[in-house]
């Protein structure tokens, strides 16, 4: 009975109304998937961004409500940059996350919900592990709680189909899909509050495990 009421309480609680001690939240994703726009929607603070892929090329830290937001450079294709430079940036992202894994409370992997299925299938046809899939697995191997923000909700015709496709490729159990994938529109703000609540929920779970 107690468990039932606790779950009911969790369903209606707004985690953003409850203060938290400083948490570190890392945003990662391919270039030009909307990370900086999403961070602006969440925090009200602008990060340098643009239409050319790869505008954010340095690690950017933002203080927000006593928390630390880390905007990682986009990985993958970056306009005007040689392949070796792109690989070096990816390596820097990997090393930073590996070195700071114990300090990271939650990672938000932002994917382009409209383009991701086609990109993933293209990589698989080449016999390669899609970079979005590889990065999700990398975060999980480091035991960093990860939520996937499926961006550009406003451009997706069948959201459920895309989410289930990603869940299969990311090897996420069916009973964890709703907690792992949050379809959003960073451009229009759709479901951003839901994502924020999920981030806070993960932080609380993380803090409980550390106590």
From Swiss-Prot:
Domain of life, source organism: Archaea
Cofactor (UniProt): Mg(2+)
Domain EngB-type G intervals: 21-205
Tagged with keyword Cell cycle: yes
GO BP, sorted A to Z: cell division
One MF term in the entry's GO annotations: GTP binding
Protein known as: Probable GTP-binding protein EngB
Species name: Pyrococcus abyssi (strain GE5 / Orsay)
Gene name of the record: engB
């Amino acid at each position: 009975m107690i468990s039932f009421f606790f779950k009911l309480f969790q369903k209606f609680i707004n985690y953003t109304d409850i203060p938290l001690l400083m948490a570190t939240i890392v945003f990662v994703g391919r270039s030009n998937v909307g990370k900086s726009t999403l961070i602006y929607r969440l925090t009200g603070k602008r990060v340098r961004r643009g239409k050319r892929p790869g505008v954010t090329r340095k690690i950017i830290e933002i203080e927000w409500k006593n928390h630390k937001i880390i905007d990682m450079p986009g990985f993958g294709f970056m306009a005007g940059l040689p392949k070796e430079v792109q690989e070096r940036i990816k390596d820097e992202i990997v090393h930073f996350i590996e070195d700071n894994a114990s300090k990271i409370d939650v990672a938000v992997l932002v994917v382009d919900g409209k383009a991701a299925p086609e990109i993933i299938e293209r990589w698989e046809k080449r016999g390669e592990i899609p970079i979005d899939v590889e990065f999700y697995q990398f975060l999980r191997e480091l035991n960093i709680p990860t939520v996937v923000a499926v961006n550009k909700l406003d451009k997706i015709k069948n959201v459920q189909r895309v989410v289930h496709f990603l869940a299969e490729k990311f090897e996420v159990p069916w009973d964890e899909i709703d907690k792992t994938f949050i379809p959003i529109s960073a451009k229009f703000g759709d479901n951003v509050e839901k994502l924020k609540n999920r981030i806070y929920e993960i932080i609380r779970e993380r803090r409980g495990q550390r106590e």
